């Protein structure tokens, strides 16, 4: 069951700056890491490619985690990699210091299709300067990370967890390098049922969430 929306992870598409790849269509006939097998990154990559009209036959898809993909991109063994994570992703930040990279923006048509198809998606801007050498904003898709718990956990425990997340949000910011925010009002956009303990917390604050 859902407990809380945590922060927006963004779909980042990374290429070498000298690759000549400037848009999603340029990935055609290229070798692209779509993330580890069965990962959230792979799912998002497949959604973005589908909405962009890029079928499996048009690219050479490989499965790698972020760290491996960054190394392969640096060495020129792949042309691009997808990474769904919070901005200021450490792996991408380190890569940007070791070689010149570019993050690819998604076009409005792809973004509009993603927003229509998936309720947890949002338009997301990666500000200029987020990574070394990134001199302009990058427009992409954000996906809300959702905390999940077993329904067997007690209502009191889950209600307290939910309360802690939102009422001590600043403490979490100091504990990570990620650029994160917690917005309680995004909970009503989650399309999976919430744990009854979490739902009780939201109800007290006038927020309706899905419970079944």
Language model regions located:
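Short, glycine-/small- and polar/acidic-enriched structural segments
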Residues: 1-28, 33-36
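Short Pro/Gly-enriched coil loops immediately N-terminal to beta-strands
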Residues: 3-10, 96-97, 105-107, 139-142
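Envelope-exposed proteins and targeting segments
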Residues: 9-11, 28-30, 62, 99, ...
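Soluble non-cytosolic domains of exported or imported proteins
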Residues: 18, 36-43, 64-67, 82, ...
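Second-shell loop/turn segments in exported
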Residues: 30-36, 144-152, 184-192
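Ligand-binding cleft/hinge of the Venus flytrap
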Residues: 42-62, 74-77, 94-96
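An extracytoplasmic/periplasmic, membrane-proximal ligand-sensing/linker region
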Residues: 64, 68, 74-75, 85-103, ...
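C-terminal lobe and pocket-closing loops
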Residues: 102-160
């Amino acid at each position: 069951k859902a407990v809380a929306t945590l922060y927006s992870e963004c779909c980042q598409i990374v290429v070498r700056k000298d690759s000549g790849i400037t848009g999603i269509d340029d990935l055609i006939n290229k070798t692209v890491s779509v993330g580890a097998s069965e990962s959230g990154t792979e799912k998002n990559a497949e959604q973005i490619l589908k909405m962009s009209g890029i079928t499996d036959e048009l690219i050479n898809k490989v499965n790698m985690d972020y760290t491996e993909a960054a190394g392969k991109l640096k060495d020129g063994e792949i042309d691009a990699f997808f990474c769904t994570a919070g901005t200021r992703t450490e792996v991408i930040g380190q890569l940007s210091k070791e070689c010149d990279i570019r993050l690819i923006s998604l076009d409005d048509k792809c973004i509009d299709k993603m927003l229509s198809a998936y309720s947890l998606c949002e338009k997301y801007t990666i500000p200029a300067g987020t990574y070394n050498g990134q001199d302009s904003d990058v427009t992409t898709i954000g996906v809300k990370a959702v905390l999940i718990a077993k329904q067997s956990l007690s209502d009191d425990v889950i209600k307290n967890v939910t309360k802690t997340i939102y009422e001590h949000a600043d403490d979490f910011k100091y504990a990570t390098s990620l650029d994160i925010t917690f917005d309680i009002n995004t909970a009503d956009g989650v399309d999976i049922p919430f744990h009854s303990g979490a739902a009780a917390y939201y109800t007290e604050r006038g927020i309706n969430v899905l419970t079944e």
